[in-house]
Regions:
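N-terminal strand-loop-strand
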Residues: 4-48
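Conserved small/polar residues in nucleotide/adenosyl-binding loops
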Residues: 143-147
Length: 147
């Protein structure tokens, strides 16, 4: 029998989806963000992030993206297209992000591989209808020229 050499431990990966929804309101391009409230070192913080979350064991990636977008923004039935995977080993180096995700998911999170989805939409009343209820909002994209 051959001895199997000791190897670096396998990662305990979590898979998440992030939804990048770009909207046009007739005047400006905007991105859909959600408010995130967290706590770090006993201090409450607020910031904004893309709608995203971990996937469930019984759903595929496309189903997860639609579910996450609906649960976090109330928006459904938009065409989401998978466009990139983010899997850097250092992605979870920001303790604030890891702590927030662990509290939200009630689970220990080590490494996260995120599949990003993109959608382009026309912003209308139907898309704006429930955003306040979900603490989501459209934020103008600012264009800057490279220095």
């Amino acid at each position: 029998m051959h001895d199997i050499p000791k190897q670096i431990p396998l990662a305990n990966n979590h898979i998440s989806v992030d939804c990048v929804v770009i909207g046009f309101d007739g005047e400006q391009l905007k991105v859909l963000l959600i408010n995130r409230i967290g706590e770090e070192n006993g201090k409450v913080y607020r910031d904004m992030k893309l709608p995203g979350s971990l996937i469930y064991m019984d759903e595929d990636l496309d189903e997860a993206a639609q579910r996450v977008l609906f649960e976090l923004t109330g928006i459904r039935n938009v065409n989401l297209m998978q466009f990139k995977a983010f899997g850097s080993k250092n992605r979870t180096s920001n303790p604030k992000d890891v702590h927030w995700l662990e509290r939200a998911m009630q689970s220990k999170v080590e490494r996260i591989v995120t599949i990003a989805y993109l959608s382009m939409v026309k912003i209308d009343r139907a898309l704006d209808k429930n955003l306040d209820e979900f603490q989501a909002c459209w934020v103008c994209l600012l264009y800057t020229s490279p220095s």
